């Protein structure tokens, strides 16, 4: 079964109002999709992370010629060559190959992987809390309230992009508005040192409705994470940008994290991603994959999560939640999969089991012009 055709879909969406995290504000959202078609007409979709002009150039100049004629069932022979050049490109191709093989077998993704242990997966609403507005705190809280009204009861908000005192004011105001009706995780995007991160214990000690403290330190500081975990009042999470399954080993062996957050798009392929999930399970660590970038990688994370054994025997708390981007983002509507009451049912159809919105794909296609409005 050979790859006959490769199509690219660079997608671009200008935001009505810039938003962001500790790394700065975003004026747009982008997504790079690929579609592989075999000589038998079987289709597989993939998603790549990166800068649209660079990704499009790479595919047109050498990735498409490299892929044409390759045997899908010989992936183990040739995909490592692509992984050596670019984990981002290989991740997208790996997703497309997985869908093709599952479709060829007449199976859903989860059945291709051995079957579903959880028919639905909890999701938490993920936010980019900062904006250029003077009243950014109120705007952030309003977004969380909109997610609450939509059925979410778990939320992740950003810290680390303002002073500690300003961020603390924001989080206290958010907790007052939620009135303990929802759980909150804080994501610092690797902004702090150990001393500053521990200052958050003052806030964490006020209430018990917390989930975790995400990447408070640069992820390479294993000793710092181990020290922080010994003294922090919340579980410590991290690892979204780690490039290989082996990269998680120092953090796991040193007991530096309570929760690992593998990201398929950084790990260079579906199997590396799933291996990272099971590695975490073998170490007795909770797992909540990072899935901020696009709807297809999030779908793969949901399906992979559904195949994991439960982390806990506590009824109703057996499987960890997946991130669901709740910001303004038209890219989220590209596939027919949405949460209901903070849960997402796992698709059971052949392949990825969802339909693409072809009109939206056409509407959002990047026209090659500048990214500025």
What residue spans do the PLM features occupy?
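Hydrophobic faces of well-ordered beta-strands that scaffold small-molecule active sites
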Residues: 46, 123-126, 153-157, 184-188, ...
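Conserved, mostly hydrophobic/aromatic
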Residues: 3, 34, 41, 93, ...
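Shared catalytic-loop signature of beta/alpha-barrel
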Residues: 65, 202, 208-209, 220-237, ...
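Structured beta-strand/loop patches that form or line metal/cofactor-binding pockets in enzymes
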Residues: 1-45, 49, 325-332
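C-terminal extensions of enzymes
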Residues: 327-373
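Metal-dependent enolase-superfamily TIM-barrel catalytic cores that perform enediolate-based chemistry
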Residues: 112-232
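Metal- or metallocofactor-binding catalytic centers and their adjacent structured scaffolds
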Residues: 36-105
């Amino acid at each position: 079964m050979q790859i006959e055709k490769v199509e690219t879909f660079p997608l671009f969406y200008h935001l009505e109002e810039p938003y962001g995290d500790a790394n700065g504000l975003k004026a747009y959202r982008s997504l790079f999709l690929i579609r592989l078609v075999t000589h038998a007409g079987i289709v597989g979709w993939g998603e790549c992370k990166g800068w649209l002009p660079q990704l499009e150039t790479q595919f047109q100049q050498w990735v498409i010629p490299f892929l044409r004629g390759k045997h899908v069932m010989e992936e183990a022979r040739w995909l490592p060559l692509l992984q050596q050049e670019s984990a981002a490109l290989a991740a997208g191709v790996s997703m497309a190959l997985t869908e093709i093989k599952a479709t060829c077998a007449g199976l859903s993704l989860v059945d291709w992987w051995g079957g579903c242990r959880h028919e639905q997966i909890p999701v938490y609403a993920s936010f980019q809390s900062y904006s250029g507005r003077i009243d950014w705190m109120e705007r952030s809280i309003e977004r969380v309230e909109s997610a609450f009204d939509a059925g979410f009861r778990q939320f992740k908000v950003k810290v680390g992009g303002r002073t500690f005192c300003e961020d603390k004011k924001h989080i206290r105001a958010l907790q007052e508005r939620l009135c303990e009706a929802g759980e909150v995780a804080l994501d610092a995007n690797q902004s702090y040192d150990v001393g500053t991160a521990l200052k958050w214990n003052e806030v964490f000690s006020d209430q018990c409705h917390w989930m975790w403290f995400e990447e408070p330190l640069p992820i390479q500081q294993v000793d710092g994470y181990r020290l922080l975990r010994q003294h922090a009042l919340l579980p410590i999470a991290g690892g979204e940008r780690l490039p290989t399954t082996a990269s998680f080993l120092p953090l796991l062996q040193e007991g530096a994290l309570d929760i690992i957050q593998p990201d398929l798009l950084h790990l260079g392929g579906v199997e590396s991603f799933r291996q990272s999930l099971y590695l975490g399970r073998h170490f007795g660590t909770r797992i909540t994959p990072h899935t901020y970038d696009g709807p297809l990688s999030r779908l793969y994370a949901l399906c992979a999560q559904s195949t994991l054994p439960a982390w806990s025997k506590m009824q109703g708390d057996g499987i960890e939640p997946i991130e669901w981007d709740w910001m303004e983002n038209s890219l989220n509507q590209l596939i027919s999969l949405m949460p209901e009451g903070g849960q997402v049912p796992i698709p059971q159809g052949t392949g990825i089991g969802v339909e693409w919105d072809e009109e939206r794909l056409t509407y959002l296609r990047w026209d090659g012009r500048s990214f500025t409005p």
